[in-house]
């Protein structure tokens, strides 16, 4: 426990919060170009082929972003919008691609949670 005079001399040190998505540089989303689109396998108790893309953002940083939903139309040189948000069972994947914006189409035949997958209202 510091004395009052010690606090007057030094003061308390602020604890700085570390960001979970540093490549976005405090922006809500960033645009980028797909460098490579591929599948990868999740960590131990789970088993699947998760769709991910390596994206070069407009600030020059390359990140791995998850492609949510069933099926996608992304390939190399596609322009995508990247938001924060990690995938728990994929190490190193700390970003999501926003469906239904730029070159990334929405999910087909999606009835529920449509806004998260960029799908228009069915007739």
From Swiss-Prot:
<dbReference type="GO" id="GO:0006412">
    <property type="term" value="P:translation"/>
</dbReference>
<keyword id="KW-0694">RNA-binding</keyword>
<protein>
    <recommendedName>
        <fullName>Small ribosomal subunit protein uS12</fullName>
    </recommendedName>
</protein>
<dbReference type="Pfam" id="PF00164">
    <property type="entry name" value="Ribosom_S12_S23"/>
</dbReference>
<dbReference type="GO" id="GO:0000049">
    <property type="term" value="F:tRNA binding"/>
</dbReference>
<comment type="function">
    <text>With S4 and S5 plays an important role in translational accuracy.</text>
</comment>
<comment type="similarity">
    <text>Belongs to the universal ribosomal protein uS12 family.</text>
</comment>
<feature type="modified residue" description="3-methylthioaspartic acid">
    <location>
        <position position="89"/>
    </location>
</feature>
<dbReference type="GO" id="GO:0005840">
    <property type="term" value="C:ribosome"/>
</dbReference>
<keyword id="KW-0687">Ribonucleoprotein</keyword>
<keyword id="KW-0689">Ribosomal protein</keyword>
<dbReference type="GO" id="GO:0015935">
    <property type="term" value="C:small ribosomal subunit"/>
</dbReference>
<dbReference type="GO" id="GO:0019843">
    <property type="term" value="F:rRNA binding"/>
</dbReference>
<feature type="region of interest" description="Disordered">
    <location>
        <begin position="1"/>
        <end position="23"/>
    </location>
</feature>
<dbReference type="InterPro" id="IPR006032">
    <property type="entry name" value="Ribosomal_uS12"/>
</dbReference>
<dbReference type="GO" id="GO:0003735">
    <property type="term" value="F:structural constituent of ribosome"/>
</dbReference>
<dbReference type="InterPro" id="IPR012340">
    <property type="entry name" value="NA-bd_OB-fold"/>
</dbReference>
<keyword id="KW-0820">tRNA-binding</keyword>
<dbReference type="InterPro" id="IPR005679">
    <property type="entry name" value="Ribosomal_uS12_bac"/>
</dbReference>
<keyword id="KW-0699">rRNA-binding</keyword>
<comment type="function">
    <text>Interacts with and stabilizes bases of the 16S rRNA that are involved in tRNA selection in the A site and with the mRNA backbone. Located at the interface of the 30S and 50S subunits, it traverses the body of the 30S subunit contacting proteins on the other side and probably holding the rRNA structure together. The combined cluster of proteins S8, S12 and S17 appears to hold together the shoulder and platform of the 30S subunit.</text>
</comment>
<keyword id="KW-0488">Methylation</keyword>
<comment type="subunit">
    <text>Part of the 30S ribosomal subunit. Contacts proteins S8 and S17. May interact with IF1 in the 30S initiation complex.</text>
</comment>
């Amino acid at each position: 426990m510091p004395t009052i005079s010690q606090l007057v001399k030094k003061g308390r040190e602020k604890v700085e919060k570390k960001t979970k998505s540093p490549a976005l540089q405090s922006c809500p989303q960033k645009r980028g170009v797909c460098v490579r689109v591929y599948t990868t396998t999740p960590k131990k108790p789970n088993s699947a082929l998760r769709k991910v893309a390596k994206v070069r953002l407009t600030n020059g940083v390359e990140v791995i972003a998850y492609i949510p939903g069933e099926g996608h139309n992304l390939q190399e040189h596609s322009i995508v919008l990247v938001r924060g948000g990690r995938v728990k069972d994929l190490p190193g994947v700390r970003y999501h691609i926003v469906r239904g914006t730029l070159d990334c189409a929405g999910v087909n035949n999606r009835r529920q949670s449509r806004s998260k997958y960029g799908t228009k209202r069915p007739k």
